[in-house]
Regions:
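Core segments of transmembrane alpha-helices
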Residues: 51-69, 127-132
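Alpha-helical transmembrane segments of multi-pass membrane proteins
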Residues: 15, 91-98
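Juxtamembrane boundary at the C-terminal end of a transmembrane helix
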Residues: 71, 135-145
Length: 145
């Protein structure tokens, strides 16, 4: 379970880092803001979210990473015994919801731009479903359960 927890942590840390970079104005992996919006945001506007929105997204993406490590018993948490599985369950549900949302027509109407729509269907949503599965595996196999 350590491998799964560490993989989740590293992946979410990297994705959170990208969101921080975008908040500071970095356009990687694209050249222009419009291209970046089309690739990673997908809404109709040509403007990236504000820096604060990028930073908030980065924080929301990062937080489940240490939770995965706690679920695997790799880091100690100074919280009640029920808090970590509750947080892990919440993370699993959020990733499951985001993963499913990417395949719904209402989501596609809200985020129709290409190549985001294709990337979302092929990569972003499946990755969210994989993260949800990882959290479920960690929850089921928690040390001491």
């Amino acid at each position: 379970m350590s491998f799964i927890a560490f993989a989740i942590f590293l992946f979410l840390t990297a994705v959170a880092g990208l969101h921080v970079a975008w908040g500071t104005g970095v356009r990687w992996p694209c050249k222009t803001e419009t291209e970046l919006v089309s690739t990673v945001v997908g809404h109709r506007s040509n403007k990236m979210p504000t820096p604060n929105q990028c930073y908030l997204a980065a924080l929301a993406i990062y937080i489940p990473g240490p939770i995965a490590l706690m679920l695997a018993g790799l880091i100690d948490a100074s919280v009640t015994a029920s808090t970590i599985p509750l947080a892990g369950s919440a993370a699993a549900l959020v990733f499951l919801g985001r993963g499913i949302a990417g395949y719904l027509p209402a989501w596609r109407e809200r985020f129709p731009r290409e190549p985001f729509a294709t990337y979302d269907r092929l990569y972003y949503s499946p990755l969210c479903l994989l993260l949800a599965a990882g959290f479920l595996i960690l929850l089921i196999n928690r040390p001491g359960t």
